[in-house]
Structures are given as C-alpha cells and as structure tokens.
C-alpha cells in the first residue's frame, strides 16, 4: 500500500496540468477497488 501511494503521489506531483485526471487514470490502472481513490480524490 505504501509503495502504491508513493507512486500515485509521484504521478500527481509530476503532472502540472490536470493532476486529478492523472490521479484517476493512475488509480484505475492499479485496481478499481483502491481505497486511496476516495481518500486522495
């Protein structure tokens, strides 16, 4: 879980235009049952 959260955070940090859109794509790439989607988004 920690490594996944770090990857998601890195994706958001590296994206300056639409971080929320990138976050949604990143979360969906991992699994549709990720609780972080509700916590971060």
Curated annotation (Swiss-Prot):
UniProt-annotated location(s): Secreted
Lipidation, S-farnesyl cysteine type: 38
Induction profile: By nitrogen starvation. It is further induced by a pheromone signal. Its transcription is limited to M cells.
Organism, scientific name: Schizosaccharomyces pombe (strain 972 / ATCC 24843) (Fission yeast)
Gene Ontology CC terms: extracellular region
Region (Disordered), start-end ranges: 1-25
Protein name: M-factor
Recorded name of the encoding gene: mfm3
Maturation-removed propeptide residues: 1-29, 39-41
Biological role: M-factor is a mating pheromone produced by M-type mating cells. All three mfm genes contribute to the production of M-factor.
GO biological process: cell-cell signaling; positive regulation of pheromone response MAPK cascade; signal transduction involved in positive regulation of conjugation with cellular fusion
């Amino acid at each position: 879980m920690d490594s996944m959260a770090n990857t998601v955070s890195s994706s958001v940090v590296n994206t300056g235009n639409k971080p929320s859109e990138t976050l949604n794509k990143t979360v969906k790439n991992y699994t549709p049952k990720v609780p972080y989607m509700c916590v971060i988004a």
